[in-house]
Amino acid sequence: MEGGNAGCSRQLPERAGPAESEPDVFTTFAVRTLLGLTTKLESVTPKEEEAVLKAFQPLHIDVNTQANNRYERNDNDGVDDSENQHCESCTSDQADPMSGSRAEPELEPEPAGQNEILLPHLRSVQTSLSESDNDAILVQGTLVHTTSDTESDGESKDPDADETGTSKCGLNNAALSAVALDGNNQSKEESDSEGYGHSDDTVGRDDTELHPPISQWLPRKLDSILEHDSSGKDRTLMDEQFSCLLATGECSPELSGEDQRPSADNVSFHKAALTERSFQLPAFFSGLRVRKKGLNTEDGETITEIKPRENDLALLKLRQPVKKSNITSGLTTKKKSSEPKASPTFLEQLSHLLNIDVSKNDERTQDSGAGFGETEDSDEGPENKASGQTEPLFPSEEIKSSPAESALDVFKALFTRPPKKETTADPSELEAIKRKMRNEKESLKAVFERSKSKPGDGPSDKSPDLSPSEQDDKTPGRLQTVWPPPKANHEEVKVGLKYTEAEYQAAILHLKREHKEEIETLKSQFELRVFHIRGEHAVSTAQLEETIAHLKNELDNKLNRRNEEARDIGVSTEDDNLPKTYRNVCIQTDRETFIKPSEEENRAVKNNQIVPKKLNISSLTHSISTQGENKDSYDVPSSESVLSCQPKQMLPPSPPPPPPPPPPPPPPPPPFSDSSLPGLVPPPPPLPTGPTSVTPHFAFGPPLPPQLSEGCRDFQAPAPPAPPPLPGLGPPVPPPLPGSGLPPPPPPPGPGLFFNSTLSSSQGPRKPAIEPSRPMKPLYWTRIQLQGSRKTAIPTLWESLEEPDILDTTEFEYLFSKDTTQEKRKPLSETYEKKTKAKKIIKLLDGKRSQTVGILISSLHLEMKDIQQAILCVDDSVVDLETLEALYENRAQKDELEKIEQYYQTSKEEELKLLDKPEQFLYELSQIPNFTERAQCIIFQSVFSEGITSVHRKVDIITRVSKALLNMTSVKEILGLILAFGNYMNGGNRTRGQADGFGLEILPKLKDVKSRDNRINLVDYVVIYYLRHCDKEAGTDKSIFPLPEPQDFFQASQVKFEDLIKDLRKLKRDLEASEKQMKLVCRESSEEHLQPFKEKLEEFFQKAKEERKKEESSLENAQKCFEETVGYFGIKPKPGEKEITPNYVFTVWYEFCSDFKTIWKRESKSISKERIKVAQQSVSKLTAEKKVETKKINPTASLKERLRQKEANVNAN
């Protein structure tokens, strides 16, 4: 409570000063000294000093500042306090317009005479300050309201009650101050509305009378203040003192203008003031309790947040604002000027001065704090600065004086400066306070000098660079700021960067360099690992291939041994024909045979069949060697092929389920029915071990070699008597020995033998047909149609190539359509448009058919006579093949033609005109003699020429490539190099080394064999070696590519002999059919329409037959040549295939030749360059040897020499 009481008592003089208009200390000391009242004054001083120190203990440094100001002012001059009061009241008026209106009721009881005494002072001080010290006057701040509302309101309601309740801590003046703060805003508005004109009328006379005395002593007082303050705070202290003067001078006129009270109240208020002797703080600190920096907050304290703005932040911390509003006594002064007051007597004025001596001394302590707060207000509110600069210019408007005040002022001016006041406080403590205050003044001086030194800054432009933390360091003991957060710490850190731009760039470059090196290291490690992995993979692949080859060799050896054993033991027996018969029957069975019968049925069948045990392997192998390609022979090539043929074709579509439970033995199964082999009698049952080794292989797939060997051993076991032969076969014929003649005739082939041929022929083209809207020029390419089920070792381009859609077909048709040289004729459809107005169009065709024919008519820009002429004369210059095909396909069918002809016969001429255009077109087309037969012959003529040309080209490419591989010596040289290099690389390996040859499937893989440094591969080395050691013409124009062209191999790889055979057969059938049609036309046509059709067609068919026979023989030769090539190079079929196709062989060569040719071109160029370089060097050597040095004789010099010689000769003569 001590801090709170001190705060209340401290605020009271600040409010009481303006309200009571107490005289300055100079006058008070003079009067008291004159009257001998100094002892009374000194007796009161120790208490107020103790109150000052106790009140400002939490503020740490504020008490030093205010106490030091108080003592310095007491030492220097007493008039300074009144000047400071004047300045404070004026500045507070402009700084915070929130106070004034509510302060008026409490300021009324104060004696008006005391307020009027200082009016002359105010005018002089305001005039001087407005001219020279605008910066000091305008130092103001925005005050944070911390005073509780209940306390202020209670104090403002009843001034009389306040007088009785504040005898100890000066609550009277505190309430006065709090209410004044609340009413500041209203007083600001009222003062604006009332204006200053009213004040001018009442005060103008007194200003002129009282101003000269004040102007004489006021400069002296200011000079004494400036001389005493040696730490650079003279401007700040002057600001504080002027604020006090303004506050004292303006409060009285304002109160007088707002509210009027009777003189009795003034007297009572005056008496209450006389009884007070305790120290009272101004109301400015009434609601504020502050804590020292670093201490904990007490329960009743209120921490005020101070917003730091500019250089005077330390001053801001010295004052704690009130919650309600700031002190604006300038507005209250204006209103007080209009209030009529009773002029007190001279004795009352003197007694009042004696009674308020304690309060006046305390107010000196507060002058510094108030001045500091107002300095901050100047920074917080720019508007306040403007008002502060204009308000002091009119002191006469705000001041009203009376004769008593003027007399007292003249009387007060006569006294000299009072003696220095002696205090009962501890001198050492006061000296310590003064030293601290000097240190603080030095720091604050540096702050303000820094802000003043900035160019272009006005009085209101304070530097905002200082942070709260910086102020705390320079002014220790100031209040700690709570808001805003100390972001200035971050700014202070940024005063100097931790690194420069050059260091930053160097760090970035270093990081980039490290990043690049790390990436290069990772790449090298990755490549090394990949190289090792590839090597390991190649080694493992080679080992696996070696293992596979070894296993294959062992398997072949075992099979050969078993076959020999079977041949030695199983010589011809009496039952040889029956096993073959049984075998053939098994081949002919379908899938149902193996699905329907149960295990008992199978057992019954096996018991009745002795055939599998009597199968002679030697006879079968002999038949393989003698028959060759005859697949329909009686002896199938081997047991493996016999057992694997049927299941591959028949069983995979639906594998048989597990056999059901065995029922009773049924009759023999379907394989032995009369439909398959009539007259077959079931044989007696064989040994029990025989069936188990054969039947499962028929049911579930091709047998494995070990199982076959067991079956062969079973066949060699002795068997019971064989059944009789078939009725139509006669006695059984013994099988021939391995070296004997031809085998017996083969049985009828089973259905499985024809499966492949029917399957491939039934498949059509993969892509739909395209029908352009106009006839296009033919593109004579070799069409390759891939079958959907065809499987090749290496996928071709045509299997994966997707045909894009043509976006703009009209442009393409316009550019590449056939060019007709004849004049443009009207479309055929226009010939039917010249009709009379038809009442109804007659349609005989259905809607879709009529629409199709109508579209055809619209697309044909031809007349019917042109079509007829082209067909009769076999002329394709006018009507091309595509148009003729369209006419042939859309011709009238038999039923349609009957309807149309009947309509023409039964209708009149006018009705015929009503017939629709499609019907008329079809009828006229049918009137061409033998249109169908003639069109078919003409179309076949074109189709045959294209088909036979395609077959010829394919056959020719196969023949040419095969002969090139057989006859070119360079091919043998290259393969010899590869064999030599391969044997050298496989040296020391028992399975791969010392090879006499190699499979050609390795040729495309040679490019994958890299050198140790990965610079070249084996193909590169072979090419380089061949060009430098084998080809004598390497690098010259005579050098020829040593292999067939890769494009020839590619075209040959697309050829299938089966397709060529089918194409020739189809051409043969179509040729025969067309020839019959031609003969029919010749029989039915009249003489006028017979020629030139007959002549041209007969000639065509004769040539077509010859070409077909020629291509058939060429195809046979090509097949033989290809087979010879396959045998020449020792090529074996691809795993899983029986035959060797051109696709497999020529694809291998195509890949190898493509790589070889690319490298060959590159190396040939390099060798050519080397040869040119060598030739140039040799030429240069020859020219250097034969070079004759010749001296160039200057013709001019030689002539002069001759002339000299002549002159010499003449002189000599």
From Swiss-Prot:
Question: Biased-composition ranges for Polar residues?
Answer: 636-647, 755-764
Q: Does the keyword Coiled coil apply?
A: yes
- Composition skew (Basic and acidic residues), residue ranges: 187-210, 431-464
Q: Spell out the coiled coil positions from the record.
A: 428-450, 503-572, 1050-1125
Limits of the FH2 domain: 766-1182
Region listing for Disordered, in residue ranges: 1-24, 66-111, 144-169, 183-216, 357-489, 624-774, 1193-1213
Provide the function of this protein.
Answer: Is important for morphogenesis of limb and kidney and may be involved in determining dorsoventral neural tube polarity and motor neuron induction. It may also have a function in differentiated cells or be involved in maintaining specific differentiated states.
Specify the protein name.
Formin
Q: Name the species this protein comes from.
A: Gallus gallus
